[in-house]
Amino acid sequence: MIKKTLLVIALTFTVTTAFAHSMDHSKMDHGAMPMDHSQMMGMEGMSDVGMPAPGAKANKVVHVILSDDMKITFKKDVTIEPNDVVQFVVMNTGKIDHEFSIGSAVEQLKHREMMRQMGNHEHDSGSTVTVKPGKTKELLWHFQGDNKVEFACNIPGHAEAGMVKSIEL
């Protein structure tokens, strides 16, 4: 009986070890693997220019000022590159609500139209924060995809008055 048990254990160990050895992925080139992210676009905040990065560690911090003169200003010059994770600290120095939204130019136009149809709708999503006067909000963003990025305030009339900032990564 003991011999049979030892034989079963030895065979199980041999088969398990051989199977585990065949599952070695250390030599796989993961960077060359095609990955279809197109289905991820349905996730809140997903964009052609990147995605929300809650919980990620930012490698850059950008202080943003939203003002009633309809400007989006970065407090300091900053170079954002593809794959950067950026923490945006967004301050509204004005007396009216403003929005800070990240996306492509096409996405911003769609967002603007949605805001126009819904009236003065305030909301926060993975790619957008609405900031009350005198308040500050943060947005953590991972840049990837299209390298032409547009920041905008899509509250009706604001972008049309100049509250848009475009950059190229």
UniProtKB/Swiss-Prot annotation:
GO terms for cellular component: periplasmic space. PANTHER family: AURACYANIN-B (PTHR38439), COPPER-RESISTANT CUPROPROTEIN COPI (PTHR38439:SF3). It comes from the Bacteria. Disruption phenotype: Mutant shows decreased copper tolerance under aerobic growth. GO terms for molecular function: metal ion binding. Keywords: Copper, Metal-binding, Periplasm, Signal. Induction: Induced by copper via the HTH-type transcriptional regulator CueR under aerobic and anaerobic conditions. Expressed under both aerobic and microaerobic conditions, the amount increasing with increasing copper concentration. Nevertheless, under low copper stress, expression is much lower under aerobiosis than under microaerobiosis. This is Copper-resistant cuproprotein CopI. Restores the copper-resistant phenotype in the R.gelatinosus deletion mutant under anaerobiosis. Involved in copper tolerance. Mediates copper tolerance in aerobiosis. May also mediate tolerance under anaerobiosis. Not required for virulence or colonization in the mouse model. It is found in: Periplasm. Belongs to the CopI family. Cu(2+) binds at residues 98, 153, 158, 163. Residues 1-20 form the signal peptide.
